[in-house]
Amino acid sequence: MNRQSWLLNLSLLKTHPAFRAVFLARFISIVSLGLLGVAVPVQIQMMTHSTWQVGLSVTLTGGAMFIGLMVGGVLADRYERKKVILLARGTCGIGFIGLCVNSLLPEPSLLAIYLLGLWDGFFASLGVTALLAATPALVGRENLMQAGAITMLTVRLGSVISPMLGGILLASGGVAWNYGLAAAGTFITLLPLLTLPRLPVPPQPRENPFIALLAAFRFLLASPLIGGIALLGGLVTMASAVRVLYPALAMSWQMSAAQIGLLYAAIPLGAAIGALTSGQLAHSVRPGLIMLVSTVGSFLAVGLFAIMPVWTAGVICLALFGWLSAISSLLQYTLLQTQTPENMLGRMNGLWTAQNVTGDAIGAALLGGLGAMMTPVASASVSGFGLVIIGLLLLLVLGELRRFRQTPPVSDAG
């Protein structure tokens, strides 16, 4: 990357055809999954008029995703990764077709929606793990920060476009259009992915999958560096669960419906700015220290968010959280990929992604519990400032991560 620029260099898309193929596939996949994410809750709500049933579908899919990440990590370290990616994407698309067919029936089956949600959650996360494990081989470890930032932008852009497109489709054609286009998009992603080179895994002894997964847990616990990265990632994800308090906080600020949308947009916007301005981040000599400081800063932004006297100041705090958490996440991703042995990349990426799923759920549950005992303002502030205290303690305790130094990479991407 350009040492003179703070802006993200997109030249990796030009110089690395394999990464460009992954970029296209990922963007199409995010939009497709976004269409699905809009359609499933709406269809279940229309069929059952029960928010509990909607929540159950989210819980089941989340559980399937967690299992898929664990299984995918083992498979990605055992089998040729391109085959795992293609198999997972194709199988996931079959589930989308099933949802489309079910929605066209005179009486769609609720059980089928739940079962296909399990199917799609499992296979979607299976492919994600293999793709993450393959990224260092596709771009080179010296370009991982740049690849991570481009990927973050892809996710944010797709996450903005897909709900809007999904809402338009629901209004004009019903859920069948969402499911059908999600299936079509998933199969289209196979075209660029077929152009990827073979992605063999390093030779390693065959062992029971549970033993292989246990070995990854042991490595995580035995490595202060990798373990510290995973712990920080989980805490940042927990902090992002503050969004469950937006509706209640919006009432205290007397926000309109249109203004509430700004609360939800603030963190993604801040994260996008963080990715766009990450041009020199890969050249930092002490990434561990920057990660720790940016993480503590993001917690402080959450603590200040709810006690702001006006909602505009709260939005600024959320955007600041998005920016700082993006810096922390990019450094987590890069250090995890560069400091993990090649033969464990699949399992470690699976565990790291799984902590994002579980961290968000735990954070939402804790905020819900706090909300039962105190006001929404107090709940958000207590959680944010509590995480600040934990973050400061980790700044002292995680000495190896704090002192970690690296030689700035020399990228050939531009």
From Swiss-Prot:
It is found in: Cell inner membrane. One of its GO terms (cellular component) is plasma membrane. Gene3D superfamilies: MFS general substrate transporter like domains (1.20.1250.20). Residues 1-21, 77-83, 131-156, 200-218, 278-287, 337-356, 400-414 are cytoplasmic. Residues 43-55, 105-109, 178, 240-256, 308-313, 378 are periplasmic. Signal peptide: none annotated. The keyword DNA-binding does not apply. PROSITE patterns: MFS. The keyword Endoplasmic reticulum does not apply. Keywords: Cell inner membrane, Cell membrane, Membrane, Transmembrane, Transmembrane helix, Transport. GO terms for molecular function: enterobactin transmembrane transporter activity. It comes from the Bacteria. HAMAP family: MFS_EntS (MF_01436). This is Enterobactin exporter EntS. It comes from Salmonella choleraesuis (strain SC-B67). The gene is entS.
